[in-house]
């Protein structure tokens, strides 16, 4: 089944496809950036009634997301958040449907330019992956833009592979994963795409 190209993201369409257009799901979005067009969670929230939480560190982008979306958007550093407390207080299930990791705007770490600070990796390991599972994970590593990010790409692959996730889409700038305990091979097999190392 091909992904639909439109104003909404391919990641979001992938989530809907492999979860059979699930209603009332849950998402966690590290790096919200856009509230509607280009968002990886807008349709999930507005057309499929998903609950979730987004994180954005850039005040202007946070303001836009908060204005245009019903689910909360936290203004702050997604790498320093108490996820367990938040998930428990907001009744998130142990098996959360979607984790989106794309932290690359507004951060500077150790004086490095944006994108070279392994921030998406920091975000990924900040989430309690040993306590919560995610049915789908999309991870933007931007290895095509910053040569240092190939190490970040490889590290997230080792982490998620060791936790039993299956890599379905491997692109020059992002990876898409599924939990094979929740999504069977026949469902995600049509989406296999490995276009890069």
How should each PLM-predicted stretch be described?
Residues 1, 15, 110-114:
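Polar low-complexity intrinsically disordered regions
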Residues 2-84:
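SAM cofactor-binding core of SAM-dependent methyltransferases
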Residues 16-17, 87-91, 124-129:
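Short amphipathic alpha-helices and their capping/turn segments at secondary-structure boundaries
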Residues 20-23, 89-96, 131:
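Glycine-rich phosphate-binding loop signature in dinucleotide/nucleotide-binding domains
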Residues 42-43, 48-51, 94-101, 105-197:
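Conserved acidic-Pro-Pro-aromatic motif
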Residues 58, 71-74, 79-99, 103-113:
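Glycine-rich adenosyl-binding loop in Rossmann-like folds that engage adenosine-containing cofactors
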Residues 65-67, 86, 179-183:
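Short secondary-structure transition/capping segments
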């Amino acid at each position: 089944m091909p992904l639909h190209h439109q104003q909404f993201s391919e990641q979001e369409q992938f989530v809907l496809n492999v979860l059979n257009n699930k209603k009332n799901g849950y998402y966690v979005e590290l790096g919200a950036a856009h509230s509607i067009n280009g968002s990886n969670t807008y349709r999930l929230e507005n057309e499929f009634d998903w609950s979730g939480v987004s994180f954005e560190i850039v005040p202007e982008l946070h303001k836009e997301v908060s204005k245009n979306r019903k689910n909360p958007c936290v203004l702050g550093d997604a790498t320093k958040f108490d996820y367990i407390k938040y998930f428990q207080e907001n009744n998130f299930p142990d098996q959360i449907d979607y984790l989106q990791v794309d932290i690359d705007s507004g951060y500077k770490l150790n004086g490095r330019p944006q994108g070279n600070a392994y921030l998406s990796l920091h975000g990924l390991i900040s989430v309690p992956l040993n306590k919560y599972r995610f049915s789908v994970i999309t991870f933007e590593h931007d290895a095509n833009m910053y040569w240092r990010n190939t190490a970040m790409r490889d590290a997230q692959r080792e982490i998620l592979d060791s936790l039993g996730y299956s890599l379905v889409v491997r692109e020059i700038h992002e990876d898409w994963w599924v939990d094979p305990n929740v999504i069977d091979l026949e469902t995600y097999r049509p989406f296999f795409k490995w276009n890069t190392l």
